[in-house]
């Protein structure tokens, strides 16, 4: 049996913390869209750090048995998207994150977003 959305979210947040991801926020998408229950947005310090963070998250999700994992952006590591079903993870380099500003689009005023940590 694979983990539910809350278990998947906890696993992702723990791994992001262990991997020293920065400025991690969680956006509650329930009732807003059918793409997932949660969105996690975080930053890595460099291309290499973004790739390493994403790799560690993927390994943990695979070990936990999360089905249907999809990943985009790994070769370049400016922005890596991990679709874990009910939880979507975006790992950015800081400049790319500032440019796309997903937090503003999905959680205006950050009322629906919470900082991890």
Q: What residue spans do the PLM features occupy?
A:
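Long, contiguous binding/interaction regions
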Residues: 1-31, 45-52, 59, 64, ...
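Basic, polyanion-binding surface patches
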Residues: 67
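Short hydrophobic/aromatic beta-strand micro-patches
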Residues: 41-43
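A short, glycine/Asx- and small/polar-enriched loop/turn
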Residues: 33-37, 83-86
């Amino acid at each position: 049996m694979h983990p539910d959305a809350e278990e998947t979210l906890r696993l992702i947040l723990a791994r992001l913390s262990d991997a020293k991801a920065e400025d991690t926020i969680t956006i509650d998408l329930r009732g807003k869209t059918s793409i997932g229950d949660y969105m996690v947005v975080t930053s890595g310090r460099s291309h290499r750090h973004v790739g390493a963070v994403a790799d560690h998250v993927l390994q943990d999700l695979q070990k936990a048995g999360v089905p249907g994992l999809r990943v985009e952006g790994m070769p370049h590591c400016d922005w890596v998207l991990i679709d874990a079903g009910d939880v979507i993870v975006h790992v950015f380099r800081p400049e790319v994150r500032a440019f796309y500003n997903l937090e503003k689009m999905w959680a205006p005023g950050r009322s629906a977003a919470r900082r991890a940590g």
